[in-house]
From Swiss-Prot:
Post-translational modification: Nitrated in effective nodules and particularly in hypoxic conditions; this mechanism may play a protective role in the symbiosis by buffering toxic peroxynitrite NO(2)(-). Nitration level decrease during nodule senescence.
Modified residues (Nitrated tyrosine): Y24, Y29, Y134
InterPro entries documented for this protein: Globin, Globin-like_sf, Globin/Proto, Leghaemoglobin-like, Leghaemoglobin_Fe_BS
Quaternary structure, from the entry: Monomer.
Protein name: Leghemoglobin Lb120-1
Species: Pisum sativum (Garden pea)
Length: 146
């Protein structure tokens, strides 16, 4: 079964909720570092601070991550696969030392953040839609890393 129109709509609506509140970007990185403190050095905007501090670079990176998952949902609905548009994405992830467990941490942080952003609209169906879209993106990035 492919990515459904309803799943795409769920990702779209919760993506809009995420974008409305910049504090969700801080929450996203706070969850990542709680789960994987050593990942701090992978992010230039975090490595010199004692804790997660809001900044334009943090906001931009969080929006890029969530935006790419959102775009993955659109691609999955349209063609059934995710193609990474940025040819350097695989190389950047290799350079930063990203390995499979990091993708799991980011997925968990993404889902927890979307759950918070969605509030009472959160459901298993919404979670599954984001999870499938994220897995599509993660697979495309891993492919670009090889």
């Amino acid at each position: 079964m492919g990515f459904t129109e309803k799943q795409e709509a769920l990702v779209n609506s919760s993506w809009e909720l995420f974008k409305q509140n910049p504090s969700y970007s801080v929450l996203f990185y706070t969850i990542i570092l709680k789960k994987a403190p050593a990942a701090k050095g992978m992010f230039s905007f975090l490595k010199d601070s004692a804790e997660v501090v809001d900044s334009p670079k943090l906001q931009a990176h969080a929006e890029k991550v969530f935006g790419m998952v959102h775009d993955s949902a659109i691609q999955l609905r349209a063609s059934g696969e995710v193609v990474v548009g940025d040819a350097t994405l695989g190389a950047i992830h290799i350079q930063k030392g990203v390995v499979d467990p990091h993708f799991v941490v980011v997925k968990e942080a993404l889902l927890e953040t979307i759950k918070e952003a969605s509030g009472e609209k959160w459901s298993e169906e919404l979670s599954t839609a984001w999870e499938v879209a994220y897995e599509g993106l993660a697979s495309a990035i891993k492919k670009a890393m090889n």
